[in-house]
Amino acid sequence: MSLSETVEPSGIVELAVRRRRGDAAETAVDRVGQEWPVALVFNGISHAVMMCTPRDLEAFAVGFAVSEGIVERGSDVKDIEVALHGAGPLPHAEVQLTVVQQAFAALKEKRRALAGRTGCGVCGIESIGLLDLVPQRLPDTGFLARLAPDAIARAARELPAHQALTRQTGGLHAAAWCDASGAIVHAFEDIGRHNALDKLIGTLTLTRADMANGFVFLSSRASYELVRKSARVGIPMVATISAPSSLAIEIARQAGLRLVSFCREAGYVDYGTA
């Protein structure tokens, strides 16, 4: 990877604000999470612009490529260049990925199939199968049987210690990778919950971790996109602090992924795998 123009941003901006409590007002310094447009470019063709916290962008780009099915494995990404443009009225970044020709040809074909659609990208599609929402059913690797009874409680207890940016801003999501005991091995924060997960998946891909031998713990709600991304890369369980959506539950059950939500040290709700 090459990194151009500037060092990686901190993820936080300090701003002067007026803070009011009751009848009193004062000038203070507030910390807010950075949000940049990040362009993802595959083999010279711009594919998407995502709004992200501008940290860990190499991991984010790889995780996005894998979890969205653009590439099948990390080795399909041959080169990554991250360009940070922090000066000017609109700071932004561009990530250039060079992928194998087979993956690029499939991406171009997918883009042609989507060309001409308007609106949300879902309207007008004839069947849910064409949405590519439900990945292949996950094999039973035995991980869930090895999961410690207090693993979810441990992850819930440990997550705040890995949320340094959230402690300062109150406005970021976290995605953590946990082992069978619930110990947190990796954790990433981002302004977008799906971005945080992509950063985590990218790191697991780049380090060649066994994604069938752990689970994801998220500080957010469980949306369909988080479940779909996790199932696509073979993660057997997703745990979230907040509520799931009905589509997230349906996708999890069809994929054979265990989804647990409302996770706290005291308990959780298990939405099952079947």
Swiss-Prot record:
Cited SUPFAM superfamilies: Cytidine deaminase-like
Active-site residues from the entry: C120
GO biological process, one term: Mo-molybdopterin cofactor biosynthetic process
InterPro entries: Cytidine_deaminase-like, FdhD
UniProt entry keywords in alphabetical sequence: Cytoplasm, Molybdenum cofactor biosynthesis
Molecular-function annotations in GO: sulfur carrier activity; sulfurtransferase activity
Subcellular locations according to the entry: Cytoplasm
Record GO cellular component, one term: cytoplasm
Pfam families: FdhD-NarQ
Function summary: Required for formate dehydrogenase (FDH) activity. Acts as a sulfur carrier protein that transfers sulfur from IscS to the molybdenum cofactor prior to its insertion into FDH.
Similarity comment text for this entry: Belongs to the FdhD family.
Name recorded for this polypeptide: Sulfur carrier protein FdhD
Organism: Burkholderia mallei (strain ATCC 23344)
Taxonomic lineage from the root: Bacteria, Pseudomonadati, Pseudomonadota, Betaproteobacteria, Burkholderiales
